[in-house]
Amino acid sequence: MRAVSFWLLAFGFWLTSVDVFSQERGGFSLEQKNDTLSVLTLKTDSTCDRWELPYPVYQFCTGDVDGDGSIDAMVGVIKSTRYFKEKGRRLFIFKNYHGLVRPLWMGSKLGGILEDFRFTDGKIQSLERTTDGKYVVAEYRWAHFGMGFERFLLKNVTREEAMKTFNN
């Protein structure tokens, strides 16, 4: 596994430093072409398929999201949606469908205002901001067509408190 650090420029200001990992687990890797274009690649023994992501990327990880035994790719992108016109952090999940990169879920929203996510123990753990400026750490699990809320690990706390739980 190799890491490449870069700064994301979005909305006219620098957001954060991000490490994008070229993970070979499941054959998925992510390459940043420029500030607003990344390419998700799936390499198998017999195929190589690519999916262009014309958005800034803030997170990338892999794991078996839907429990089917194959590795999926989770990509955090910054974009607006049909229902949420303001640009925000979104979660896209891609699967390996016979050696091809195919969308599993391109959700417009989890629960709150998504800041970050990770994949642990078959669940997506999220760091989210609420409309009143508080923070929550929540867990989601695949629920047939999309992510289903499991539980709050922490809620109605400061960002610093939420980060401690999220980073452990």
Model-assigned labels for residue ranges:
Residues 1-18:
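Short, basic, low-complexity termini and linkers enriched in Ser/Thr/Gly/Pro
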Residues 18-168:
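Beta-propeller-forming repeat regions
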